[in-house]
Amino acid sequence: MTSSPREATTPRAHQFSLEGRTALVTGSTTGLGLAIAESLGDAGAKVALNYFNDRERGEAAFEQYRARGAEGCLVRGSVIDGPDIERIVTEVESTLGGIDILVISATPDQPHHPIEEYDWAFHQQMLDFFVKSPFLMARAMLPRMKKKKFGRIINIGSEVFRRGVPNFSPYVAAKGAQSGWTRSMASELAP
């Protein structure tokens, strides 16, 4: 599903322009991910909205995005499966052009339970999602970004790992690991 450029009529006035840029925002059919996609589109970027499970919600979010006058596409795919990530990136590139901005905002459900009610498998599932996803997404995008000598990778973090939120330990641990990985990647890749 794609949209073509139209004169944007948006509620936000931007102090910067992303005209000529293309963004991929994972988990962008609801909440923060959708707000980020809309803001990037408002600033003139072509944005690929990503979803995995709920096609109807994805299509509704994309229509909401398009109604703002922004250009983009909707792409389904898993952000924790290497071959699927490669397919997502290739599809966005063929539809919108090279990706300049990658926003990693996808998230699974985050239940609240006492520590003793979680098992290690659920902790591992959270770590797999919040560390594996940014790693695989960055690994897919870095060669492309380095080749064109431009790119931005934005990982959406959370303050929960600093605050130690109770009944949320798997998510807190995973977001702490994601934050450490992101800081290390930023130090390695900074100009």
Task: Give the positions of each predicted feature.
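Conserved glycine-rich Rossmann-like NAD(P)H-binding loop of the short-chain dehydrogenase/reductase
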Residues: 45-60
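The beta1-alpha1 cofactor-binding region of Rossmann-like NAD(H)/NADP(H)-dependent oxidoreductases
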Residues: 55, 76-88, 120
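Active-site helix of classical SDR
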Residues: 138, 174, 182
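Alpha-helical segment proximal to the catalytic Tyr-Lys
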Residues: 143, 187-188
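Residue(s) in the substrate-gating loop at a strand-loop-helix junction
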Residues: 158
